[in-house]
Regions:
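Short, solvent-exposed loop/turn elements at beta->coil junctions and helix N-caps
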Residues: 40-47, 158-163
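Acyl-donor binding region in acyl/amide transferases
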Residues: 83-169
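Short, small/polar residue-rich loop motifs at catalytic or cofactor-binding pockets
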Residues: 50-53
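Conserved beta-strand in the GNAT
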Residues: 57, 64-74
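A short, polar/charged loop-to-alpha-helix boundary motif
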Residues: 37, 75-87
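C-terminal "cap" of GNAT-fold acetyltransferases
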Residues: 163-192
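Short amphipathic alpha-helix that is part of the acyltransferase structural core
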Residues: 1-45, 55-62
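Acidic/histidine-enriched, glycine/proline-rich intrinsically disordered or flexible terminal extensions
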Residues: 181-223
Length: 223
């Protein structure tokens, strides 16, 4: 297997500082296209804080600056997926272990490989946690076409307003994680070698993860 080292590292967010760095990346990336969302994305949200999702952060090796981030929520951890709070998933989907990728963000001017390796982090995290499928929301036709080229299929015919994305309308798409390797191999997909035939030592899926701090003890003063 080929080994590829890159100019950045990807790790799970493991501290409040790293979570804030992820929010900086989100605010810059989304705020570039949606200035009205920049403020909302600059702070951790409830899903970041409840411990039911894992956020990965890409850090430039030279500058130490945060340059990319993605968040993955698993249905098996007991929290309703964000898009399913705005959209009624079909019964067949609700029976499957599934993951939602949100807040995919890369700063302007970053290495194009950052987004690819964030996708690999999401894919392998799903495989490691035995997810059957992955779901995402996409707004722009160009982005929907990108997802379709990866093997995503539409679950909606009309866009759905997402409460967690400023009520902007999104299409819901999904793909089967469990069969992806075989399908990409059989179709000679252009990313097969990168995703399944290359070792990336700069990608760490299972390092320390951020956990919500326990509540401070309440001091009881004798009456």
């Amino acid at each position: 297997m080929e080994t590829m080292t890159l100019g950045f590292r990807i790790r799970p967010v493991a501290s409040d500082v790293a979570l804030d760095d992820a929010c900086v990346v989100r605010a810059e990336s989304y705020g570039h296209h949606l200035p009205e969302m920049k403020s909302a994305y600059s702070e951790p949200d409830d899903l970041d804080r409840d411990g039911s999702a894992t956020t990965f952060l890409a850090i430039d090796k030279v500058s130490g600056a945060p340059i990319g981030s993605v968040r993955i929520q698993l249905s098996t951890l007991g929290s309703t997926l964000l898009l399913e709070r705005s959209w009624a998933a079909p019964d067949w989907l609700q029976t499957l272990p599934r993951a939602e990728l949100t807040r995919m963000s890369v700063v302007s001017g970053a290495d194009p490989m950052v987004k690819l390796l964030l996708w690999k982090a999401g894919l392998y995290y799903c495989l490691a946690n035995q997810m059957h499928c992955m779901v995402i929301g996409a707004r722009k036709p160009a982005l929907i076409r990108q997802y379709a080229s990866l093997g995503f299929e539409p679950l909606t015919t009309e866009p759905v307003p997402f409460a967690h994305a400023g009520h902007l309308p999104h299409h819901v798409l999904w793909f089967n994680v469990a069969t992806l390797e075989r399908r990409w191999y059989e179709s000679n997909h252009r990313l097969y070698g990168f995703m399944f035939g290359t070792h990336h030592p700069d990608l760490d899926l299972f390092g320390p993860r951020w956990r919500p701090s326990p509540p401070a003890p309440v001091e009881v003063v004798p009456s």
